[in-house]
A protein has these predicted regions:
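PRPP-associated nucleotide enzymes
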Residues: 1-331
Length: 331
């Protein structure tokens, strides 16, 4: 891993942050040993966003940290305007560091006459000036293919798995919430040397509608401590999985997710006996009111992002990040 200090980067390097997660940007800067670039961002009374770059960046290699989390549209628009300002100020290259990629769940048309919003966002980012994208644990990995510029797809898997390994979860079992996350769960299971189980949703059509019948548990969970994994937690519906597992004789569950989207009503759903801890990262800020009585443990993704940024800036392989963590993941 990298060693902090100003010697890691040169004078052509600049790190900026938007207002979506300034704490993460500052932490990345601290690890790299650089101060954040000088930028003024304001919102006018009519909700328009104004940006002023307050230092010369001509010919510089720019990294702008801005997850497009809630409020998604405001933070996305702010990122686009910042990149436009950077481009017009003659930045040599602009890398958008988007730890959480909003609209990633709208990656395809589920029914007719729907947009593919993730593709639209990709087009907007490139049009605004992005030359490269860095993101973490996309909800749909195929979004990388929406871009014709380099896209570095990182994963928080090792960060989360290391924490769970130190917890010494007794008689643990990795649980995938659905078939789509099975491969991701398998990587967790390999890292933690634990068995794996799968929640399989069986559906049946009634009167022309698609109605969920039940979630079957494939695998042995009785007497074990489940670790339910996913890329994000939003509405809090994952609590149903925890309840189902406990009903089958499992211990209260850990939930391990990268992105704590946590909508307003989700915290009430997640504060229940079937869930003992939610382990997540700071790709999105988690305010105190969403800490769910201390059940939420937030790990820092800054070291991973700092390592990737430094390697890109120095034209080194980003895949080395994953080799160091003994993780095989598409980048």
């Amino acid at each position: 891993m990298l060693t902090a200090g100003v010697e890691n980067v040169n004078r052509d390097f600049r790190l900026f942050t938007g207002r979506a997660n300034p704490g993460l940007g500052k932490e990345i800067g601290s690890i790299l040993g650089v101060e954040l670039g000088k930028i003024a961002i304001a919102t006018f009374p009519d909700s328009e966003i104004h940006v002023q770059i307050e230092e010369s960046i001509r010919g510089a290699d720019i990294y702008i940290v801005q997850p497009t989390c809630e409020p998604v549209n405001d933070n996305l628009m702010e990122l686009l305007i910042v990149m436009d300002a950077l481009k017009r100020a003659s930045a040599r290259q602009i890398t958008a560091v988007i730890p959480y990629f909003g609209y990633a769940r709208q990656d395809h048309k589920s029914t007719g006459r729907e947009p593919i919003s993730a593709k639209l966002v990709a087009n907007l980012l490139v049009s605004a000036g992005a030359d490269r994208i860095i993101s973490v644990d996309l909800h749909a990995t195929q979004i990388q293919g929406f871009f014709d510029i380099p896209f570095d797809h990182l994963t928080a898997l090792a960060t989360l798995a290391s924490y769970l390994k130190e917890k010494h979860v007794e008689n643990g079992v990795i649980v995938s919430p659905d078939v789509g996350r099975a491969k991701f769960a398998e990587k967790y299971a390999d890292l933690l040397e634990l068995p794996m189980a799968l929640m399989h949703k069986r559906r049946a059509g009634v009167g022309g509608t698609d109605v969920e019948v039940k979630a079957e548990i494939i695998g042995d969970v009785r007497g074990r401590t489940p670790i339910i994994i996913d890329d994000l937690i939003a509405s809090g519906s994952i609590y149903k999985h925890a309840d189902s597992l406990v009903a089958e004789g499992a211990n209260p569950a850990y939930i391990s997710i990268t992105h704590p989207v946590l909508t307003d009503d989700s915290t009430q759903r997640l504060n229940r006996p079937s869930i003992q801890e939610i382990v997540t990262t700071n790709t999105i800020p988690v305010p105190a009111e969403k800490q769910i009585d201390g059940k939420v443990s937030v790990l820092s993704i800054a070291p991973l992002l700092a390592e990737a940024i430094l390697r890109i800036h120095k034209h080194k392989s980003v895949s080395k990040v994953f080799l160091d963590q003994q993780v095989i993941f598409p980048v």
